[in-house]
Amino acid sequence: CLVVKLSAEVTDLSESMRLTLKNGTGRVIACLTNCVQEGVHKGEFPVNLDAKTVTEEIYYMWIGATLLTKVGRTHAALECAMNATKERLGLN
């Protein structure tokens, strides 16, 4: 993931790059939030789901899982993130 690779390297060195990454991740989260909201409206996800909060939690979890996958060279963190995502969205 580009965000994972660049964020640790360039955010301390370049304010403009930090702001670009911040803007980009904000747009990704906004897009995913819209998808979750649409799923709630279609009855695919629980009605009581706070789409923005859930989306942020899931996004942050996947960023962490991506980092741990690189460090551990195993897919365990990604599998854990997938299971947690399904549970959080009520898909289990």
Model regions and ranges:
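Short amphipathic alpha-helical interaction patches enriched in hydrophobic/aromatic residues
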Residues: 11-14, 66-70
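C-terminal peripheral helix-coil segments that are non-catalytic and often amphipathic
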Residues: 26-42, 52, 57, 61, ...
